[in-house]
């Protein structure tokens, strides 16, 4: 059974100084999908972000990387969703995940924000609807909560970045499966993947 996903969002902080930081892992998924489909994301002020449109398995999918700061991501998502009449249940948000190690990613539907400011604002701006899909890109944890801010805004060492890149690539392939064959088939594949 195919899955109706109409909007894929990659959470990020804007600007070149943040582009390669762990907190921007969600945006890497959208950038890779745009690259694979040979489109250029365009800045759209009314949606507070970089946007694009692709067709996957005959289904239109809008792409968004908010250019607000992370803690205001919901403003961009809500603006685009409202304009195109996209329901929260038709949105997939890709984001960095401290609770998964680098090299691992997981799909999830619904749930809380787990302390992630981008997810927190998204839930709030979608009227506290938590039923959107998430693509959680593992970045690992620094070991202590006081180190989290510096960790997510830091760049991964090369050995770790190669795991993140491989995970993003596999996530894009599994997104294709999700749209064509549904969540459980996509989970079956992505959740057994581990970048080496």
Curated annotation (Swiss-Prot):
Function according to Swiss-Prot or TrEMBL: Hydrolyzes ribosome-free peptidyl-tRNAs (with 1 or more amino acids incorporated), which drop off the ribosome during protein synthesis, or as a result of ribosome stalling. Catalyzes the release of premature peptidyl moieties from peptidyl-tRNA molecules trapped in stalled 50S ribosomal subunits, and thus maintains levels of free tRNAs and 50S ribosomes.
Subunit composition and interactions: Monomer.
HAMAP family attached to this UniProt entry: Pept_tRNA_hydro_bact (MF_00083)
Main location: cytoplasm
InterPro entries: Pept_tRNA_hydro, Pept_tRNA_hydro_CS, Pept_tRNA_hydro_sf
Gene Ontology molecular-function annotations: peptidyl-tRNA hydrolase activity; tRNA binding
Keyword entries, A-Z: Cytoplasm, Hydrolase, RNA-binding, tRNA-binding
Enzyme Commission code: 3.1.1.29
GO biological process: protein quality control for misfolded or incompletely synthesized proteins; rescue of stalled ribosome
Any one Gene Ontology cellular component term annotated for this protein: cytoplasm
Active site (UniProt): 23 (proton acceptor)
Site (Stabilizes the basic form of H active site to accept a proton): 96
Site (Discriminates between blocked and unblocked aminoacyl-tRNA) residue list: 13
Enzymatic reactions: an N-acyl-L-alpha-aminoacyl-tRNA + H2O = an N-acyl-L-amino acid + a tRNA + H(+)
Protein name as annotated: Peptidyl-tRNA hydrolase
Recorded family membership: Belongs to the PTH family.
Record carries keyword Magnesium: no
